[in-house]
Curated annotation (Swiss-Prot):
EC number(s) reported in the record: 6.3.5.3, 3.5.1.2
Catalytic reaction(s) noted: N(2)-formyl-N(1)-(5-phospho-beta-D-ribosyl)glycinamide + L-glutamine + ATP + H2O = 2-formamido-N(1)-(5-O-phospho-beta-D-ribosyl)acetamidine + L-glutamate + ADP + phosphate + H(+); L-glutamine + H2O = L-glutamate + NH4(+)
Annotated protein name in UniProt: Phosphoribosylformylglycinamidine synthase subunit PurQ
Pathway(s) it belongs to: Purine metabolism; IMP biosynthesis via de novo pathway; 5-amino-1-(5-phospho-D-ribosyl)imidazole from N(2)-formyl-N(1)-(5-phospho-D-ribosyl)glycinamide: step 1/2
Role description: Part of the phosphoribosylformylglycinamidine synthase complex involved in the purines biosynthetic pathway. Catalyzes the ATP-dependent conversion of formylglycinamide ribonucleotide (FGAR) and glutamine to yield formylglycinamidine ribonucleotide (FGAM) and glutamate. The FGAM synthase complex is composed of three subunits. PurQ produces an ammonia molecule by converting glutamine to glutamate. PurL transfers the ammonia molecule to FGAR to form FGAM in an ATP-dependent manner.
GO biological process: 'de novo' IMP biosynthetic process
Molecular function (Gene Ontology), one example: glutaminase activity
Cellular localisation: Cytoplasm
Catalytic residues of the enzyme: 89, 197, 199
Domain Glutamine amidotransferase type-1: 6-221
GO cellular component term, pick one: cytoplasm
Main location: cytoplasm
Amino acid sequence: MDNFTVGVVVFPGSNCDRDVSWALEGCLDIRTKYLWHESSDLSDVDAIVLPGGFSYGDYLRCGAIARFSPLINALDEFVKSGKRVLGICNGFQILTESGFLPGALVANKNLNFICDDVELDIVSTKGGWFNNGDEKQTIKLPIAHGEGRYHCDSDTLKKLVDNELIALRYKNNPNGSSFDIAGITNEKGNVLGLMPHPERACDETIGGTDGLFTLKSLILK
């Protein structure tokens, strides 16, 4: 995978792009390239990460303005080609606003910003996410969000369950998410959105390495 490159998207207001790049390059030796949101040329990257932060200041709704950027418009063909896309926190919000993933991320039930480490059950490894030859069924990752409560209607929830599209569930739901959902994939399995931050759990010196389960999955084909 010497030539494999992960594009890390940068929006006005992104603040986790460097964290993602550090985790991929420093912990996994995976090459990264920053992609400014106005770019529509994705030809030289093999996978894409939409990082956390506050794209466009989260005006209107989280991810509501970012969905109109040229890069997100170009993402449609990228996804259709089968290449992998990971949306973390604000990136997950952008993926739902853009229609790449169903449902929505809304204000936490307690209306407060939550910053904590949470335990998560790996519910599905659809598309190869979290499936790196390890039998671990529970991981611990940090969360940091004010609008991270996953919400969908009953028909969508049934579809998520029936098609094994729920990747992660909270053990102790911190934000009121429907069905304790912390992360989901698309039907093809090459797009994953999750509210927890795997890039903040890639080295023991910063609290753990469970985030590697997610980031390693980017290099699968």
